[in-house]
Amino acid sequence: MASLACGLAIGCSNANYSRGPAVEDEVDPDALVPDVVVEKQSPAAALRVGFARKAYTPVLVDAWVDVNGNAKWDPGVDTFTDGNGNGVFDGYWLAGFSQGRPAQSVHDDIEAVATVIDDGTQRIAFVALDAIGFMNGEVEDVRKQLPASLGVTLLNVHSTHNHEAPDLQGLWGKDFGNTGIDPAHMAATKKAIVDAVTEAVGKLTAAEMRTLTVPQGALAEYVADTRSPEVFDPDVHVLEFRDAASKAPLGRVVNWSNHPEALWGSNLAITADYPGYVRRGIDESITYGSEKKMDGLGGVTVFLTGAIGGLLCPRGNLEVTDRFTQEKITTPNFEKARAIGYGVAASVIEASKGSNAAWSAQAGWNRRSRTFEVPATNQKLVIAAQVLKIIKRDFARHLGVPYITTELHLLELGDAKFLMMPGELYPEIANGGVTVPAGADYPKARKLDLPWRQMIPQGGTQFFVGLSNDAIGYIIPKTQWDELAPYTYGDTEPPYGETNSIGADTGLVLDEQLRKIVKLPVPDRGSEDPN
């Protein structure tokens, strides 16, 4: 959740460093750039898998004092120690919630956590960043930096959507006119991705895999849906790997849908939020002080955030119960992050240890990928990029409408089906429950009534991974789009979401692209008529 206090009100959707023509350039004005399609299926073969993690936590050079206690940098009120002697305050601006929130300390490392999965034909890498978002242009840049000798055929870079780490998009600088991106930190982030993938390739080991689905159960209290209709993406999905010879755990991918914002907007410490506790709990142990509550599984955990639009989050006043201490926690703090993270970790540990699911040493990647354009009708995005220049994203124009380029991937490996989505998907698109509420702006638009979980191949375990290879903001059903009065569900003001989306057609465009991937007919988009 990115606060409207960011001023530009385009939230988690809009940063990139150079892809395609600038918005001023009228290139092919009468037609979209053709989609780029990649389809490649490997035969089932022996698997090799490697895992690695690299911290990219910045060193805080300048210390500062929040004199008035408002969790924001106020020049002339707050004070700082000029650690590098350059005469200015050099802050690392925390992304999410509001601008002007520089880090005061480091609570725990932020990391690039990687797995590389090789079937002998295709070598596909996944890297998860403890970041709010990482733009498609940045992903393309890292792909170019990967040495060809690594043999990686596809690199996926995912952001957990962490709201307590330095800005990698540009929206959360010291004020509306300044980017929040520190160039050195951006470079360190990219290096961490490359280093993690390089190490994971070096650790490729003959492996066996299996998948698990962990029913949400008690985890339900850790997440709220803050916008009607109330639809969740509840379960935890796990892809496990073990050494084919020794049977020792190598690592796993864990996928769950909940915004990492347990600390909320007054926190000033860099942290991975609850996903850090998920990883440490599973990989090492669940420990409180000197007391170990549960042994971990070993190996390395890659945490991938799911369909979190709508908005699925541990909202500031949400009461959660720590299953190990039985403490009920309402205040946003590290105890809340720990309760959520260790709760998820415990559910995965128990499911893994109790599972009789068969392991498989052979599988083959079936990759179906599309790169395409999406209309960017949120004019604040264009202003932020082209006028204020606090973010960097390029556009093409077609018939006067700006477009961005993004990508969508359906990746199958045995029983595991990954849908790599470029933004924050509303869970009703994934699971069903899309509505046409009274007061919606486009009631005659095509209703997304075929849930994506039914659209992609059935059987096995589905991993819906948000903020993958881009961060284009909320992916909203057009029939629920609501910027204009009268507002839906009897609200007196517009709901949260639209100002953090690149446009009302985003959900329709992505639905069309997924239909093309799975060879389904693409229906008409319906009418723009509001009546």
What is each of the regions a protein language model found here?
Residues 1-9:
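Bacterial N-terminal signal peptides
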Residues 13-158, 165-339, 345, 352-531:
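Conserved beta-alpha junction segments in alpha/beta enzyme cores
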